[in-house]
Amino acid sequence: MGRRVIILAIMALLIGTVTLIGCGGGGGEAVGTLQFHANGEDFVREGFVSKDGWSINFDHVYVHLEDINACRTDPPYDPHVTAIIDSDVEVGLPGAYTVDLAEGGEDADPILVGEVQNVAVGHYNAVSWQMEQASSGPAASYSLVIIGTAEKDGESIDFTISVEEEYRYSCGEYVGDERKGIVEDGDTADVEMTFHFDHIFGDFDVPPDDHVNTGAIGFEPFAPLADNGQLSENLASLEAKLSAEDYQTLVRTLATLGHVGEGHCYCDKQPQS
């Protein structure tokens, strides 16, 4: 009889242990939602004046984004050192997205590309993405298509500049007025892919010797390529028509297009298939 009681007691203890383990694993993990935004900033939504005095307004700025990821890294990832993000946790946004950065008015929020739910809490302090050729849609065959109008001294040029090269941007923590990527239990956080188009055209409102202007091509080199106020070029045609120096400047600026706020990114140009 005593032996039976002992066996039953052991069985009850085991059942209780299994029950406790089951309850702990079912709802104990803290999770939240992580959103991915793309932002061309006010330069794209409002227009601006290039370093060489052209007033530029954008109708559409299409970027095609794939392989989008946010990572938790410790120590923090440094894009000035390597392209490799050594992460503890990685959250990928599935799919491919063509985003119009010029969409919305002056006060428009950054564009929501997508979100991932039930991600582990923590600080996602690194972001990476690829700017790849779109297979269809308004950016078909290109990774970036810039459409707008440039005006100076009574001359007006409707332009389309298309980029067929592909780039991978690996970025550290967002730098701006607020920190991003901090996911808390039950809450929503966001990370941002930022694009600095003043790096291409420069900015008349900052000094000529500012790094933004010294590294930018401006718009003046494009103007002579217009025919009856119309300009439509891609990188291949621009390589043939621009001076070697201007073309190399353009190529360099495209590699610096991707940011996280004011935070920098490491850029790899992707091989063409």
Regions found by a protein language model. Give the residues of each.
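A short, solvent-exposed, low-complexity linear motif enriched for acidic/polar residues
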Residues: 24-273
